[in-house]
Amino acid sequence: MHKINVAQKLGTFEDHWSPKIVGELNGQHVKLVKFQGEFVWHRHAAEDELFLVLHGVFRMDYRDDAGAERAMELSQGEFVIVPRGTEHRPVATEEVHVMLFEPAGTLNTGNVEGAMTVPNPQSI
């Protein structure tokens, strides 16, 4: 058992949209990621995801059950759980620091593979 200094871990990388694993519990990865710009629309068929804002503000775009596009803004200290199967994309005009909780092995781009896909996130 050991403690993790989140600020120190965030200081070890600068890249955006590249989640880093900082812990694991009960088959879940705890990840840190920096957002800036627009991510790809995607969904996770089998995994829920929790996004906790540590610093900054971002918008979570998502499509509801009827396929209508919706959005919510999240600020420091707020979190959202994106249910499995929900199409979504984070958008950040300024750099945002986020902690993610998701099942180990969850692909960051879900059902979409491309330039933003990180198949094997680094542990830091």
What are these regions, as identified by a protein language model?
Residues N26, L54-H55, S75-Q76, E94:
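A cytosolic small-molecule/anion-sensing beta-strand core signal
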Residues D64-R84:
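Short acidic-glycine-tyrosine-enriched beta hairpin
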Residues D15, H29-A45:
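Conserved short histidine dyad/triad with adjacent acidic residue
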Residues M1-K31, E113-I124:
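A short, N-terminal "cap"/entry segment at the start of jelly-roll beta-barrel domains
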Residues R84-G114:
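Ligand-binding loop in jelly-roll beta-barrel domains
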Residues K34-F35, H44-D64, F101:
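Short, conserved beta-strand element in jelly-roll/cupin
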